[in-house]
Amino acid sequence: MTEHVQPANPSDATPQHRYTAELAGQIEQRWQDRWSEEGTFNAPNPVGPLAGDVPADKLFVQDMFPYPSGTGLHVGHPLGYIATDVFARYHRMQGHNVLHTLGYDAFGLPAEQYAVQTGTHPRTTTEANIVNMKRQLRRLGLGHDERRTFATTDTDFYHWTQWIFLQIHDAWFDKEAGKARRISELEAEFVSGARSLEDGREWASLSVSEKEAVLDSYRLVYHSDSMVNWCPGLGTVLANEEVTADGRSDRGNFPVFRKHLQQWMMRITAYSDRLVDDLEYLDWPEKVKTMQRNWIGRSHGAQVKFQADGHEIEVFTTRPDTLFGATYVTLAPEHELVDDIVAAEWPRGVDSRWTGGAATPAEAVAAYRKSIAAKSDLERQEYKEKTGVFLGTYAVNPVNGHKLPVFIADYVLTGYGTGAIMAVPGHDHRDYEFATEFGLDIVEVISGGDLTKDAYTGDGTIVNSDFLNGMSVADAKKAITERLEADGTGKGTIQYKLRDWLFARQRYWGEPFPIVYDAEGNAHALPESSLPVELPEVEDYAPVSFDPDDASSEPSPPLAKAVDWVNVELDLGDGLQTYRRDTNVMPQWAGSSWYQLRYIDPTNPDVFCDKENERYWTGPRPEIHGPNDPGGVDLYVGGVEHAVLHLLYSRFWHKVLFDLGYVSSSEPYRRLYNQGYIQAYAYTDARGVYVPADEVEEKDGKFFHQGVEVNREYGKMGKSLKNSVSPDEICEEYGADTLRVYEMSMGPLDTSRPWATKDVVGAQRFLQRAWRVVVDEESGALRVTDDAPAEDTLRALNKAIAGVSEDYTALRDNTAAAKLIEYTNHLTKAYPGGAPRSVVEPLVLMLAPLAPHLAEELWSRLGHEKSLAHGPFPVAEEKWLVEDTVEYPIQVNGKVRSRVTVAADAPREEIEKIALADDKIVALLDGQDPRKVIVVPGKMVNIVR
């Protein structure tokens, strides 16, 4: 037996052995120490430094890891962590080898901005924040394998982030094979003649630099002079996903401008089809799948060629059936052809609405581009007022030869299709609005609408379309595409909204690129032996930011200041030469794109993850999950806000690693679960400034801060809203197990719920009742007996076991808690002098996933030397799950009038007889015979008068 803790200095009014917050704190500290000392939650690997005996039944549970904020956790943060801990603990008790740990997503803008504000190096603040967060998480009793934790800022971790970057850089996407291959294989095909150059040149005739340029054009990581989102206020470029709907930065809320810059890009678009198609095999919320499908935006249509002033405008349309209804062509203002085809002067008689008041088309274009520079893509698509200018040029419709005026307009984007549209105002709302604004023709080509009022976008018969007349829309699409292909003026094709991933940031706090440049500016990937490229320690790590509204500013990365680090002498095969390091850093998504794999093999110095360990933890298991199982982490829990950022990026990286043979799973996460959020009230004064929520008083339905009335709003919990509640505060006042039970009892895990500190005491009272089932509050003695339990208790026990097991498996911890409360109440009422051990111990075991410290303490007091962390979890006996009796509601003419309880195996005739003999029914019938009696076995009795 182990020594049991006692509460220090209990008050006279409180029984000496009551389960108080003070006693809970002592119990929790003691068991946390023991778990850590004994490695209770250490999960063995098949091979390597963490090798051990591994059972076939395994479970890999993962949380979306946190950013180590300087403010620490509030009670909303642990919601998902506690839920996964309950899930992991339950399955560990079922005999599974459970891998559950937690790392820290520590690179990126937030840490750097916080460091700049405080004047402390980001590594110093980040490491201090991690220490504090680890302390907070440990206090919650999370059963993590502490050997597997890391931060993305650890050199041993980002060594492998850089290594994966090099593998992607050294790969290309073979469209015929539908997968990534090594760039050396592509070069071998060029050398052998198995693959020809697109321009017809012979490979052997190319210079070394020309060959490198060809290979670079195929790589999955490439340099591009691309249109990017430039944020002067942050001093960096941003991915599309990091820009808000109103054209501002997600971090800092600064204006974002579109401009051309030379940047590293990742060719995620090569995987568009697989990223869409493989969603079918994932056990993910349909909402997230839909978000990814919409973000990738795959659409079938036709690419049509319009001749314009000696140039060819390629237009992608999903509605080639409406080609005869095109009355103008519109280009995105940034389209590469705009400057080539803009006319020198306005055509005679041009409509003044088309010119923007400019003297020449070129002046109109320049002024228009300037006017829309600060608009986000979403603003440009949704803004009600349609704007644009005429280029003074006409394009020829390939199906009827009509001359169509060519405009630029901000509602056309370069990021989708070809950046050019054929405008069909009769059957597209935005085109209709533009045509109405500019006095352009509107032609009906699909019957069924009233074009004097609005565009018609419904189905119908094709009209005013020559050889298509009388066809359905579907038949017309097929026929026009065949005609375009036959004439050489178009072809059927597929387009995507997804753009390649902008993979560089002009910041300090991120992973350095394993890339150097020679004197001519050519990029060279470093050999693996040069990894890791460590982030240099610099005194001035602040970003070079600019006037937030200065769209003409240019990036100036902080790493460029580290001259001694930037300039380096290396021998890359041509003798010792001076090179210049890349001074950008990777985006904050880099580490999270593969971290699940490092959890598997966190201390391996030779590879990022041993193949045998990866196969064990994340390899496909078709015998369990079906023939199309992609493999991956068994359960991944986190917020839905990462649907098109982290989750899309991680799928892309993982698929490349799969194609190159480094992993056996084709997807990183087999099952995804999105938890809801804990929300809270916040309060603002007359100025709209938030005031501390804990200083607000309620009087007669109104709310006051320091005597002044304030407004109440409901939403997220956070420091800026001044409504945060620290888990430390709740643990101190009630204990960690109480916090765990309260958060899991608040409602279904996938819904948001309001925090109410005053309600936490309810969870504490439940745990106190569970404590009293085992321990006498006055003496501290055990209250259990060796008596045989009553049959109704055995029924209650086995019903609880079956229900709680089902709930834990399905992440329904709120209903599991309700069943445990019900069973605890049964034991309390049925056995005031002490319950039988045989029905108490299963309660303690069932309680363990939710309230592990309390359960361990009670299990120990019941005489067990070993921890219950590895079970066994109780198993229900089927014979006790069959009910002896059934309650039947009795309806009379459709309304429930009474209820009767009968034997579960009672025949229909007896049920009818008992129902008709019920006092309330006898009174209602008043001596009359019912017209009909319907007995639904096990459900109800319906009487028709």
Curated annotation (Swiss-Prot):
It comes from the Bacteria. Its EC number is 6.1.1.4. GO terms for cellular component: cytosol. Keywords: Aminoacyl-tRNA synthetase, ATP-binding, Cytoplasm, Ligase, Nucleotide-binding, Protein biosynthesis. GO terms for molecular function: aminoacyl-tRNA deacylase activity; ATP binding; leucine-tRNA ligase activity. A motif ('KMSKS' region) lies at residues 716-720. CDD domains: Anticodon_Ia_Leu_BEm. It holds the Pfam family tRNA-synt_1_2. InterPro entries: Leu-tRNA-ligase, Leu_tRNA-synth_edit, M/V/L/I-tRNA-synth_anticd-bd, Methionyl/Leucyl_tRNA_Synth, Rossmann-like_a/b/a_fold, tRNAsynth_Ia_anticodon-bd, Val/Leu/Ile-tRNA-synth_edit. It catalyses: tRNA(Leu) + L-leucine + ATP = L-leucyl-tRNA(Leu) + AMP + diphosphate. A motif ('HIGH' region) lies at residues 66-77. It is found in: Cytoplasm. ATP binds at K719. SUPFAM superfamilies: Anticodon-binding domain of a subclass of class I aminoacyl-tRNA synthetases (SSF47323), Nucleotidylyl transferase (SSF52374), ValRS/IleRS/LeuRS editing domain (SSF50677). GO terms for biological process: leucyl-tRNA aminoacylation. Belongs to the class-I aminoacyl-tRNA synthetase family. PANTHER family: LEUCINE--TRNA LIGASE, MITOCHONDRIAL (PTHR43740:SF2), LEUCYL-TRNA SYNTHETASE (PTHR43740). This is Leucine--tRNA ligase. It comes from Rhodococcus jostii (strain RHA1). The gene is leuS.
